[in-house]
């Protein structure tokens, strides 16, 4: 357990605690705030797991979005466990039913691909890592527990909670928590921030409170959210908030639906804030170019 892999002190501490918990439990969830390097910790853990095991051991890493799959593949490659993914438009890797690339003994899947193609998967992994593990309550993830009950599992998340207030003890045996956000900020690992919210008795909050339907994961249903919240009055208020609190700064807006995202981008652009919408239907190459453009230019 002496490997450091360039980890920060708190990442090294979390890795040590994880391997200690694996001595007692088969399935462990790890919580770390957004921005503290969960993916780097994940890669370091996988590398140490493989180095400590026998020849032929295999690891599956499962994520819920294509972008996360590519991000994890890139990080895993930097840790010497495979090559970086080809993101070109010609690459069949981004196709709906294309086989994820073999990266040595580590393979990274989207849960959608894995659920569609599980019958063609040969053998079994020795470790399954679930990125954004708060999604693990979905039946597609639960199937992994049913099919591979004896396989060691690791869940990584910033938010180990469900909107239906139920825990994860049916999937994970124990939870390892990191420092608080305040402590990360105090030690200089996270930036400080200002938090602005709508009032508890506002019209907007009443609209949110009026949402009644829930999905299988306890979250709001997209169709109802779009019907209730995708309105010009709400979008105008979002725009006014940007002007008031974030004028001239870059930002990301998380919309409730694809249609909502496109309406927001159109409204912002019409009123002088250059904006684009990116969603699950955006082609991979175009998505990559838009993200790079956002990083490198003044696009807000």
How would you describe each model-predicted region?
Residues 1-31:
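Conserved pre-motif I regulatory segment
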Residues 93-127, 138-143:
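Conserved helix/coil segment N-terminal to the catalytic DExD/H
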């Amino acid at each position: 357990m002496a490997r450091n892999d360039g980890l920060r002190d708190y990442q090294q501490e979390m890795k040590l605690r994880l391997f200690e918990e694996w001595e007692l439990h088969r399935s462990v969830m790890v919580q770390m705030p957004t921005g503290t390097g969960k993916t780097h910790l994940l890669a370091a853990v996988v590398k140490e797991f493989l180095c400590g095991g026998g020849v032929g051991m295999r690891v599956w890493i499962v994520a819920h979005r294509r972008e996360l799959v590519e991000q994890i593949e890139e990080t895993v490659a930097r840790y010497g466990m495979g090559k970086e993914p080809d993101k070109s438009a010609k690459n069949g890797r981004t196709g709906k039913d294309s086989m994820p690339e073999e990266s040595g003994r580590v393979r990274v899947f989207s849960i959608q691909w894995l659920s569609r193609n599980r019958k063609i998967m040969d053998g079994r992994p020795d470790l399954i890592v679930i990125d954004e593990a708060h999604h693990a309550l979905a039946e597609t993830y639960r199937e992994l527990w049913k099919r591979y009950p004896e396989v060691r599992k690791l869940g990584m998340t910033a938010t180990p909670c469900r909107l239906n207030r139920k825990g994860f003890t049916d999937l994970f045996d124990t939870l390892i928590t990191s420092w608080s956000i305040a402590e990360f900020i105090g030690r200089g690992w996270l930036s400080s921030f200002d938090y602005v919210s709508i009032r508890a008795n506002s019209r907007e909050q009443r609209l949110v409170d009026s949402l009644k339907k829930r999905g299988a994961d306890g979250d709001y249903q997209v169709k109802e959210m779009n019907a209730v919240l995708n309105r010009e009055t709400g979008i105008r208020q979002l725009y006014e908030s940007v002007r008031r609190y974030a004028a001239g700064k870059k930002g990301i807006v998380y919309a409730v639906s694809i249609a909502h995202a496109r309406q927001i981008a159109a409204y912002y652009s019409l009123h002088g804030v250059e904006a684009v919408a990116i969603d699950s239907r955006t082609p991979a190459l175009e998505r990559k170019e838009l993200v790079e453009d956002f990083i490198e230019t003044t696009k807000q």
